Structures are given as structure tokens and as C-alpha cells.
Amino acid sequence: MPEGHVIHRLARLLNDAFAGEPVSVSSPQGTFAQQAAQLDGHVLERAEAWGKHLFIHFAPGNGGASGTVGGAGAVLGPERIVHIHLGLIGTFRLQPADVPVTGQIRLLVSDGTTVAHLHGPQWCRLITEEERDAAVAKLGADPLRPTDPDNLATLDDVHARVARSKRSLGSLLMDQKLYAGVGNIYRAEVLFLLGISPDRAGVGASREDKEQIWELLTDLMAQGEASGRIDTVRPEHTPEAMGREPRKDDHGGEVYVYRRAGQPCLVCGTPIATAVVEGRNLFWCPTCQAE
């Protein structure tokens, strides 16, 4: 499942391509056709991400007739935000409009120069501003909204809830009601980099633990948003520095423990351990992260 940095990067790319412009909107697959027709020709105001959720806001003014951009059309009603969650297999990509797009396309957005195409999302809905606010209210603090006042208020609550919890940090970090946008890779890598056992309970975590987890999530996810991949290894542990083969994985990036079960730790040589926590395989070093 794409982690939050992917969704924030996607929101930025959508804004770069379409923000402030009228766009054509369609659903070649047909599942979202009725909603797409309402949006067709309207101005795409902005895209935003909160955790793993993407919200695309459209202006309430007149839209174009079907298949046009910028013509006169119906006024858009209160349902003018597209809410997307990619789930495990969804993809949303941008490319030049003159390059053919294939496959089952749930949503197609274009300005004639660039096209964005959505495939296989967990959901793609047309919602109101109130429904967007309600969805965000259910989410925890987002490391990629470090200066958002609402997010910082949520973070204070998250730290308090973690401090009272008997659940392990390996479990808590996957809870989207606490850490919005954090997924399996960042969970494993952050705990390793801080030398924290994934079995440590929230109630047993120090204030420093919680603050360091948040700060590292903020830094690493910002790097991931900028580069489009997850890299967590320090310079001294890169393939070039260690004379080892680069990691070969569909997720890309150089990491310490994620999907490295049984392989030697890049720091101490201990075989990386794995266990299922919150329905996903968690990875850690029993030596570097000893409790």
C-alpha cells in the first residue's frame, strides 16, 4: 500500500499540472462516470493529502459541456471534492496527454497537455466539504503536515494516547488514527534507526522516544516525497560504501530492515527478524533493537 509520502507527492504533482485550470474529467471504466460528468470542465482548485487520503477540490462555478474544457455548463453542487484512497493496488499517475493510456481507468483528468489516470483504487468518491472534514477528523497526525496548526494539536493528542497505551510501538505506528500516512516501511525503518524495540509498549516509551519517532518520520517522509522513493541508510551503509549489491525490490530504495528477513544487519551482522504485527510483516534487528 502506498505510504503517505506517495500521496503527498501525488497531490503536489496534480497541483503543478492542473491547479487553477479548467480540466476535462471522465471515467472510461464507467464506475465513476456520473460523478465525472458533473466535474467535467470545472476548474481544479487544488489537491491535498492527509495521510493516505487524497482530496481533489473543484471550483463551484460553471463547468464546461461534456468533453470540453472551459465552456459554459451547470453550476457544481456541494459535492465537489474527489476523495481517493489507493488501497493496496491502486495507482494514480501523470503523463503527457499524447501518450496512450491503457487499462481500466476509474478517473481521467486532463488539460490537453497532461493527463492523470487512476486505476484500481480502494475508493474514488465525490464528497462535500463537510464530509472531507469528517474524514480528516478520523485521522491522526500527519508527519508531512509539520506546521499545520490542526495537525500539531492532533499530535499532542497522539502523544498522550500513546503514553497511555499498552500496545506495542510496532502496532501503534500502523494505526492511522494516530500516525496518518505511516506504513510498513517507515514503521520498521524508524524504529531501527532509533534503536527501539518494536515490542516496547506505548506506556513504556519515554517522551524522548515519542518526539524522536515523530521528528524522524517528518524528515524521512519529506525526503521520500521529494525523491519518490524510500531511502533510509546512512552514507556509510550504502552499497558503494559497503561494497555490496544494491537492493532489488519493487519498492526501490536502500533500507536497513524492511523485507530483509534472515539477511545480516547492515550495522551488526545479526540476521534480521520478522513477525506479523497488525496484519503486516514487521522487520527488526534483535541486537540493534534489543529491549
What do these predicted regions represent?
Residues M1-I127:
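Gly/Gly-Pro- and Ser/Thr-rich, intrinsically disordered tail segments characteristic of DNA damage-repair
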Residues E3-V6, L10, A19, R132-A135, ...:
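Alpha-helical structural motif
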Residues P22-Q35, G67, R161-E291:
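Basic, nucleic-acid-binding surfaces and adjacent catalytic neighborhoods in DNA/RNA-processing proteins
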Residues V69-G195, A201-G204, I213:
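Phosphate/anion-contacting hairpin/loop surfaces
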